[in-house]
Structures are given as C-alpha cells and as structure tokens.
C-alpha cells in the first residue's frame, strides 16, 4: 500500500510540474540606458517603445510619461527558453509567442485572450533621472 501511495504522489507531482500556467521567468542583467544616445531615440518621447537586447530574452521598454517607464522581459512566462516577438500589426505594444501564438500586452505584462498561460510577463522596476534609465 505504501508503494502505491508513493507512486501516486510522484505522478501527481510530475503532472503538476508540467502545467502550462507555471510562472518561472528568470530575470537577467539590464545595464542602464542613456536615452539621449541615438541608439535609444525611440524612448525619448512619451509612448515610445523599444526592445533592448538585455535581460533574459530581451526587455521591452515603453515610456508611459515624462518620468515613467514600463519594462518587461520578452521571455514567455511559462517557458523561458522561448523569446516573444513584436506583433506584426501592433508592434512593441503586443508581444507574440512564435511557438503557440500566445499574446501579451507589453504595457502591463498581462496575457491576452487565448494565451496558453495565465502568467504575466516578468516586470522590471525602473528609475529615471532625466538622462539615464535604470532597469532592475
């Protein structure tokens, strides 16, 4: 009887580990960004958005006001080896998984209708001193 209980417990744990709503996105190093650098010109205006080759699978950054920025990792939340891509129609404001088609709002990190996972994108904190954007 103990053998059956142990096997059943192990099977249940293994099944729970395969669920698609497991949120486990690691975060990566993000170096500060000088928004006056021409490379980051998209971030100089409110509403500007840019995907930086930083973080774990890239970081989408959007300037939401003069002093505020939102930053999310482009790794798919339930499978961090997959990098989300900008939507062909919506650009950097919507990120799409090339494998399953799941879509995420890059302004708040939320999954959109039809996403395989209910997990949100990994959110980075930001600070801005007027010249340098720090993402952590």
Predicted regions and their residues:
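Bacterial N-terminal signal peptides that target proteins for export
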Residues: 1-7
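Short metal-binding segments enriched for Cys and/or His
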Residues: 104-112
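C-terminal motif of bacterial Sec signal peptides marking the signal peptidase cleavage site
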Residues: 14-17
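N-terminal pre-ligand scaffold of iron-sulfur
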Residues: 19-91, 105-106, 122-136
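Short loop/turn microsegments at loop-to-beta-strand junctions
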Residues: 67, 99-100
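Short cysteine/histidine-rich metal-coordination sites, predominantly Zn2+-binding motifs
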Residues: 90-99, 111-123
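Gram-negative bacterial Sec-dependent N-terminal signal peptides
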Residues: 8-12
């Amino acid at each position: 009887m103990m053998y059956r209980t142990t096997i059943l417990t192990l099977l249940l744990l293994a099944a729970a580990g395969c669920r698609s709503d497991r949120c486990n996105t690691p975060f990566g190093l993000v170096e500060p960004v000088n928004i006056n650098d021409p490379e980051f010109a998209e971030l100089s205006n409110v509403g500007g958005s840019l995907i930086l080759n930083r973080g774990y699978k890239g970081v989408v950054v959007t300037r939401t006001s003069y002093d505020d920025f939102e930053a999310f990792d482009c790794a798919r939340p339930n499978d961090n080896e997959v990098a989300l891509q900008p939507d062909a129609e919506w650009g950097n404001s919507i990120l799409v998984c090339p494998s399953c088609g799941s879509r995420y709002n890059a302004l708040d990190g939320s999954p959109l209708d039809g996403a395989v996972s209910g997990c949100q994108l990994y959110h980075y904190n930001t600070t801005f001193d007027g010249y340098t954007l720090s993402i952590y």
